[in-house]
């Protein structure tokens, strides 16, 4: 899904590290596709791409507010939301993955936690 994102910061040492604000969430992402120089304070169109490099860690949870929580100082996040039609929906964001339908369809309509290794952003 394409979002309007506000660029909040760009790391001076790692140019692919971009801080954004989207749907009220402040996220630090890895810019996997950066076709132009970004300006802090400008709004751009971009797609958020959760990356899982190994095993999918998905768990049903309860009594937790949907959110996107950064794990440590890297690009890893724990995404908490409701699973709907193969998409994890939380705080105005939607993260879709065919694995949700194939392997986790039994969690449809439930609140789940998903561990992603890296949250990429692709500017369009």
List each language-model region with its residue ranges.
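Acidic (E/D-rich), amphipathic helical modules within compact regulatory domains
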Residues: 15-61
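Intrinsically disordered, low-complexity regulatory/interaction regions
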Residues: 39-49, 53, 75, 80, ...
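Generic recognition of long tandem-repeat/solenoid scaffolds
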Residues: 19-22, 86-90
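Short beta-rich binding modules
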Residues: 11, 22, 26, 49-52, ...
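A structural signal for the main folded, soluble domain(s) of proteins
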Residues: 40, 57-59, 66-71, 75-77, ...
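Beta-strand/loop nucleic-acid-binding surfaces
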Residues: 23-38, 91-111, 116-121
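Structural detector for short beta-strands of small beta-barrel domains
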Residues: 1-12, 61-87, 113-114
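Flexible glycine-rich surface loops and low-complexity tracts that mediate binding to linear polymers
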Residues: 41-55, 81, 108-124
């Amino acid at each position: 899904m394409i979002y309007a994102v506000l660029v909040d910061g760009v790391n001076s040492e790692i140019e692919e590290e971009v801080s954004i604000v989207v749907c009220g969430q402040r996220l630090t992402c890895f810019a996997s596709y950066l076709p132009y120089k970004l300006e802090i304070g400008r709004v751009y169109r971009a797609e958020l791409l959760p990356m899982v490099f190994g095993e999918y860690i998905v768990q049903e949870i309860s009594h937790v507010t949907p959110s996107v929580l950064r794990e440590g100082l890297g690009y890893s996040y724990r995404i908490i939301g409701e699973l709907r039609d193969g998409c994890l929906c939380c705080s105005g964001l939607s993260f879709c993955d065919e694995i949700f339908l194939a392997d986790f369809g039994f969690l449809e309509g439930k609140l789940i936690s998903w561990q992603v290794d890296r949250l990429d952003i692709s500017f369009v």
